[in-house]
Structures are given as C-alpha cells and as structure tokens.
C-alpha cells in the first residue's frame, strides 16, 4: 500500500491520520479470531481498566503477539509495516508491541487524555501506533486526538482510574492542559471507523475516548512500530508495558535491537 504524500504530510504535521481499508476483509476476520483467542487466554499483563461499579468492562492486554499467530500475521505480513515506514519516514519498521483494548457494552469508563510515549522505555521521534477496530466505531466513541500535540511537550503519565503518578515523579513533567474546557485552543481530530479502517498516531499525540453504548462492543487491536531513530530509554521504574530483563540486555541509548522488537524486513500480502 502506497500512501499519498498528503497523508504522510498530515501525519507528520498533525500527529494523527485515518487510513481506510488498510486491512483486507480476510485480515479483519483473522484479527477478530486473534482477539477472541487473546480474550480466552489473557496474559499476566492483562488488566481491567474500568471501576468495579461500571456496568461494562474495559479490558486491556499487552505483548501477546509472539504467542498469537493471528496477531503475528497482522504485525508482520499485512500492509502495516510498509505503511508504518512511510508514515515514520523511516527505512525500517521494528515491532514494538501489541495492545488489546476491549470495551464491553455499556462501559462508562473513558480513556482519559494522555500520551503513550511517557509510559514507555523508548526515545526517538520515528514511531507510529495503529488503532484498529474489528467492530464499527461511531464518532462519539472513537479515539480523539489533539492536533499537533506530538511536536514538543511531554505530559505527566498517570493511571487511568485514579490518576496516580506511577512513572515519572510528581512535578517531573507538565500536567495536561484544559483540553475539553478550551476546545478552540486544542483542536481535535476524530473519525468514525469501519472494520478494516485504522487511525495512525504518533506516540506523543494526546488522545482520549469515551465509553460505549449499551449495545456496542468496541474491540480494538493496537499495533506499535518504531523507526530508525528509536533508542532504549532505561527507566528506574516499571514501564507500561514492562519488558522484563531488557535493561540487562540493552544499554541506555542503544538501538532497540532485541528479540522482543524484531525488524520487519519483508512485507507480503496473503
């Protein structure tokens, strides 16, 4: 898949773009099967990100692609690696990790405004996350982005349910601006999506989403890639997701050259 120059430019300038039909119908079917397998075999990293009194559940899981052939196929053999290289303007695409996000019908728990990269153990500007639903997603429950928020400031990462600082120490990074209170100052991007569509966004782009309606299930697979300039940013705390033993194998500032993060050298569509 070759992207238009305007799509690449919008990604670089705005920090998020929509990609229509980036997965084929057969790939959507395969991914749906992979999500079902993941939900039936949650990993030790899985968590419920909604509160106990929520009528639905917000389920997350991380880093299962090496044990899930459907996920591995999507990450390696779909159009995603080649699209990632184009968006990142990188000669390489390295798998960083996968992330499952499922909001069951009636889930009230929102996904609060945040950036992804402050939770991670990686530095560099060449990166991309794909947010890929296998269910139709109406605009009101789709992911929202603050345009151009990926260009500078790192904001304080906090837990979703109770806003605790479990990563950077309090005061180490800027607090979130009043995004929803001042919409004119923080223009937003969002798109309704169909299965096969994806949104691609930079790991520093501020994003959030609402809960879902009483009859809506929102099953999403996120695929994350790193480009040429990605480097290991060793942290004195447990990152989200954690990569146990990585600090012993990779020096701080080293390229992300580890078996956990393979380069995708060839792209083949099945």
What are these regions (language model features)?
Residues 1-14, 20-113, 119-121, 236:
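Non-heme Fe(II)-dependent double-stranded beta-helix
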Residues 34, 41, 45-53, 158-160, ...:
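Non-heme Fe(II)/2-oxoglutarate
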Residues 80, 90, 105-107, 136-139, ...:
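Short, charged/polar surface micro-motifs in flexible loops or helix N-caps
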Residues 91-93, 97-98, 109-111, 126-132, ...:
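Generic beta-strand structural signal
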Residues 99, 115, 132-136, 145-147:
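Short, structured patches in soluble enzyme cores that scaffold and shape functional sites
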Residues 116-118, 127, 207-212:
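Glycine-rich phosphate/pyrophosphate-binding beta-alpha loops
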Residues 121-138, 192, 224-227:
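Short, conserved beta-strand element in jelly-roll/cupin
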Residues 139-206:
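Double-stranded beta-helix
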């Amino acid at each position: 898949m070759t992207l238009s120059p305007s799509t690449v430019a919008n990604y670089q300038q705005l920090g998020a773009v929509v990609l229509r039909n980036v997965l084929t119908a057969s790939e959507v079917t395969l991914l749906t099967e992979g999500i079902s397998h993941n939900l039936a075999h949650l990993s030790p990293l899985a968590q419920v990100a909604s509160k106990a009194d929520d009528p639905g559940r917000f389920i997350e899981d991380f880093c299962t692609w090496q044990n899930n052939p459907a996920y591995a196929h999507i990450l390696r053999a779909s159009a995603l690696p080649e699209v990632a290289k184009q968006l990142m303007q990188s000669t390489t695409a390295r798998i960083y990790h996968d992330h499952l996000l499922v909001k069951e019908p009636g889930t009230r728990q929102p996904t609060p405004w945040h950036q992804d990269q402050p939770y991670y153990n990686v530095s560099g500007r060449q990166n991309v996350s794909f947010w890929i639903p296998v269910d139709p997603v109406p605009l009101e429950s789709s992911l929202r982005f603050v345009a151009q928020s990926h260009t500078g400031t790192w904001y304080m990462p906090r837990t979703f349910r109770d806003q605790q600082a479990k990563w950077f120490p309090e005061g180490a990074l800027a607090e979130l601006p009043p995004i929803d209170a001042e919409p004119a100052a923080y223009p937003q991007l969002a798109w309704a999506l169909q299965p096969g569509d994806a949104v691609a966004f930079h790991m520093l782009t501020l994003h959030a989403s609402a809960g879902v309606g009483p009859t809506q299930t929102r099953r999403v697979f996120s695929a994350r890639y790193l480009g040429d300039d990605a480097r290991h940013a060793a942290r004195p705390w447990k990152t989200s997701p954690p990569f146990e033993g990585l600090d012993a194998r990779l020096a701080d500032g080293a390229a992300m050259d580890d078996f956990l993060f393979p380069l995708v050298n060839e792209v083949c569509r099945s």
